[in-house]
Amino acid sequence: MTEPTDFQLLELATPYALHAVSDEERLDIERRLSAAPAPVAAAFDEEVRSVRETMSVVSAATAAQPPAELRQALLAAAEPAQSRRQPRWRTAVFASAAAIAVGLGAFGLGVLTRPSASPTVAEQVLAAPDVQTVSGRLGGGTATVMFSRDRNAGVLVMNNVPPPSPGTVYQMWLVDAKGPTSAGTMGPTAVTPSTKATLTDLGDSTTLAFTVEPGTGSTKPTGTVLAELPLR
């Protein structure tokens, strides 16, 4: 069983990932981490990795380093969770990505850093005032979608998802009341430890589903649904 002190340790993963602790606090966290149960230590490491990878995604999407204010937004998003004592290693990326989206909306990084070009789909989504974030497990890794109904688009980030077997592809499906519509495929060479893709024309879809399909994909899902992320 995970003890309350373990939850308290996990709550420190986000500020630790953002180097928002003093040297003394960092040493104390690392001491507690070395004595923590293996599952707790693994969850701590996963949250640290997720926060840092999400920050890297934003830097790549906007061609700029996230500003100091964005770091503060991340810390502020993590703060309320401390009173809830829930297993934040499963929800950390929600708060992190949502805070990033809020930060980008406030600071307009895409526009400021690319004045001579139209914002990319990723920049538009991340800067949208209605941006939402969902995340779930996919093939042993994590799939996170940041999406905007105003922009009718989304950004998919897959971390540590193993590539599909040779001769198959991951296929994404936008599902609405009429059924699934293909949102693209990813073959073995397209899937890396951190894979990014854009989703366009969300329409009235309420779910993003993932299946494994043969060859270069299918017109309708034929494989087992690996994951479903609600787009609500």
UniProtKB/Swiss-Prot annotation:
<keyword id="KW-0805">Transcription regulation</keyword>
<dbReference type="InterPro" id="IPR051474">
    <property type="entry name" value="Anti-sigma-K/W_factor"/>
</dbReference>
<dbReference type="GO" id="GO:0016989">
    <property type="term" value="F:sigma factor antagonist activity"/>
</dbReference>
<dbReference type="Pfam" id="PF10099">
    <property type="entry name" value="RskA_C"/>
</dbReference>
<dbReference type="GO" id="GO:0006417">
    <property type="term" value="P:regulation of translation"/>
</dbReference>
<keyword id="KW-0812">Transmembrane</keyword>
<dbReference type="InterPro" id="IPR053877">
    <property type="entry name" value="RskA_N"/>
</dbReference>
<dbReference type="InterPro" id="IPR018764">
    <property type="entry name" value="RskA_C"/>
</dbReference>
<comment type="function">
    <text>An anti-sigma factor for extracytoplasmic function (ECF) sigma factor SigK. ECF sigma factors are held in an inactive form by an anti-sigma factor until released by regulated intramembrane proteolysis (RIP). RIP occurs when an extracytoplasmic signal triggers a concerted proteolytic cascade to transmit information and elicit cellular responses.</text>
</comment>
<comment type="similarity">
    <text>Belongs to the anti-sigma-K factor family.</text>
</comment>
<keyword id="KW-1003">Cell membrane</keyword>
<keyword id="KW-0804">Transcription</keyword>
<protein>
    <recommendedName>
        <fullName>Anti-sigma-K factor RskA</fullName>
    </recommendedName>
</protein>
<keyword id="KW-0472">Membrane</keyword>
<dbReference type="InterPro" id="IPR041916">
    <property type="entry name" value="Anti_sigma_zinc_sf"/>
</dbReference>
<feature type="topological domain" description="Cytoplasmic">
    <location>
        <begin position="1"/>
        <end position="91"/>
    </location>
</feature>
<keyword id="KW-1133">Transmembrane helix</keyword>
<feature type="topological domain" description="Extracellular">
    <location>
        <begin position="113"/>
        <end position="232"/>
    </location>
</feature>
<dbReference type="GO" id="GO:0005886">
    <property type="term" value="C:plasma membrane"/>
</dbReference>
<dbReference type="Pfam" id="PF22618">
    <property type="entry name" value="RskA_N"/>
</dbReference>
<feature type="transmembrane region" description="Helical">
    <location>
        <begin position="92"/>
        <end position="112"/>
    </location>
</feature>
